[in-house]
Amino acid sequence: VITKVKSSKPYTKVTFKPDYRRFGIEGLTPDMMALFKKRFYDICAVTDQHEKKIKFALNGVSSSIKNFQQYIDMYIGAKEESKRVYEASECGRWEYAVAQAPGQEFTQVSFVNGICTYKGGKHVEYVIGQIVRKLQEYIEKKKKVKVNSATIKEQLILFLRCDIENPAFDSQTKDFMNTPSNKFGSSCTVSDGFIEKVAKMGVMETACDLTQVKEKNTAAKKTDGSKTRTVRGIENFMDANLSGTAQSGSCILILCEGLSAMSGIVSGLSSDDRNIIGIYPLRGKLLNVRGESVKKITDNKEITDLKKILGLENGRAYETIEDVRQHLRYGKIMIMCDQDTDGSHIKGLCINLFHCEWRSLTRIPGFISFMNTPILRATKGATTLSFYNDGEYNAWKTATADAAAWKIKYFKGLGTSKSDEFKEYFANKKIVDFVYEQASSDDVIDMVFNDKRANDRKTWLIEKYHKDSFLDTGKTHVGYSEFVDNELIHFSNYDCARSIPSMIDGLKISLRKILFSAFKRRLTSEIKVAQFSGYVSENSSYHHGEASLNGAIVNMAQNFVGSNNINLLEPNGQFGTRLQGGEDSASERYIYTMLNSITRSLFPEADDAVLNYLDDDGTKVEPEFYVPIIPFALVNGIKGIGTGFSCSIPPYNPRDLIANIRNRLTGQPVAELIPYFEGFKGTVEKIEADKYLIKGLYERTGPDTIVIKELPVGKWTMQYTKQLEEMMDGSTDKDGKKSAPIIKEFTSLCTEVNVNFTVVFPKGKLDEIIASEGGVDKLMKLTTTIKTSNIHMFNAERKLKKYEHVEQLIDDYFSVRYEAYQRRKLALIEEMSNRARLLTNKARYVEYVLIDKIDLRRKTAETVNAMLLSNSFDMIDGDYKYLVKMPMDSVTTENVEKLRRERDETLRELEVLRQTTLEQMWLRELDALELRYRDYKKLREDLQSAVATEKKSLKRKK
């Protein structure tokens, strides 16, 4: 059929109609559709869409895959998440990338002329052969270690796309190409630079470690234990009397957290227990042995101690209970740790040790166990209830009407327990045995502790974490997967929470504790940073050392270019400058800080009553999160790395954020947000959907002279001075050849606030540089890039979430802030209603006393209560103290009128509040913040201008 068409451009259209009946199916199955989808992405990856201007769409949706590198991202994640090295040949026929394989097995994804070669072929051998051979040579040169080719290859995953002339395959499925390399029609040489990057990606280090395993195993054998009657020379170890004997199978080795825990455990043991129970105190956390070098493992004192205590031999398998009884000094390991997240981590590290080194022991039912001890107790009269995790307690508190009447005792660690309580623990013996669940147990333990499985941990935390999910402490057997998913996950989540902030307030835990303490102390007058950090530790239960706290306080107060757009604390003293990126701050003993006046405009005091405060050992500490009136997470920018996650967000202009929220509230369109750095004189330019170019500033002042007036954000003045010195001296390449100097001389008039370098080039050199690609910006390194694609943050449910862009983050923030206004309004209505009721009752009470309608003299408390009740006075907090405790001088006619005026004013304010919408409340506070920010910004600009006009000494380099 010949049909006329409107288009003048030639094209080919291929359609097919599957004969479902012929294939015995009713339609396309999900697997078939998945295959089509996979092939669709394959086509996108191997077709040069930019050059040929070909567009791809599947079911009407355009593909986001534009090149082979983006296709690789679908396998291993974005470049920011997973390291890889990419290279393409000059002829355009070859492009390839290498990453570290997730398991110890070589993997390849390859294409020949657009055909997916699942099984590989000569083209794969051709490229991987070069990579492995050159890596062997590189490692031998750098490390003086001869590495087997298989040791390198098994670490790699290769992505390869190539064009071969007349390729031949071993079957009609074309999944293996067997054309010899001399008939490829082109050649590909893997560059030395590519090899160096692959080696530094971690391949060289791992290959060296694996190569040395054989030799080091000999050393490991020297630390082996054996089943002996006694073990000597192990510090702080208390051996069971029957260990190493014919009855060793009934002996239990307790691994506890520290010496204080050991003392408590000893006090709880009976004489019979001492025969079968041994105790070894761990010094903090065990080494994560997964992926570690054998040398590091054999040099670890705790691990070598455990080998001797248990009689463990390196490389030996203990498959059955009988093997344990015959070869080991103990028949069971019991872990006793604090009931907090760090205790869970120690349990996990113990499991990981045996799973890595003696995996068969993790499969023997009950060989590894732990004892549950209370994290808190609730007492009322003679009744005592024990709770073994926060989830149990919170569920009980919610379900118990009189929970507030119970006395709560927290057991922060095992050291909190008394001797009689330890005796109780061993009498009750709430021992939980770990159970092996086939391959799922192996996978989940490896996933949590394998450094190479960061992406899997990321998925695990996002999909599995729930703040109210805890182990059922009534169980006597728990699978490894259940332990990891319901207990250990809280440690990983908390580890992230210390490094990655909440999207609502943009604060990490330490910063939130600092802000909480500043608000609690009403820090409106200056205090030494060292003193304030002590106050924070005491009042917010900060447990990670005051050194890191001092650093966090200093960072919150810094206000140089590239630090904070809004510093929540004031820097009264030397808190660091852009000269050295804040590293030049003075000691915390000599500098002072206080709340910035703008801080309460961002975090209104009226919110404090409706925040959800956390509880630490019975002490009210910081809230779960603050709810600032603009998304503060975007004000100062964020950088953080946690378990499997990282977060990187540039800062934005507070004025733009105020306008964004205002427009959302009033139904107006919102403008695109562009990263902003307070005081930065350069430019920020969008170059991709999620990528920005940051440029410094220079001015040409003569034929061979420029003045650099701004550096890209994050490049500090002294760092750049060193760079200029190197450019003036000339550089030396890796072969020792020295190149000519790029600049002739430079002069620095830089201050701690402003950049001012005068750079002189050799005669005629500047014109040459300006004419070259990238020009002065590139040569002088006056540009850098930032991305907005790595936004992982905690949401309102305390779950980690990936935000595709900042607008999506603002959407989530907006709903949480709106709900906070709703809670605040209801709380204020209740507070004002109660105040009006109290004032009404007080006015009426004074009036009744004045007219002798009530006479409380010589009356019992019971009679007084009955009299007030009969006159319809309201009880407040269950009694009438607010009335009967009123001073006698308040019982006057004037006070009646005063109380009624206060009541009427309160009722008027209440009515105004009821008529005020949530939007109006928010807009009013945005207006106030905008005015406050205007003053704040002017003050910063004035400070910068004042420094700029000061006379500075001249520094010349020649």
Whereabouts are the PLM-identified features?
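Conserved phosphate-chemistry cores used by DNA topoisomerases
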Residues: 1-958
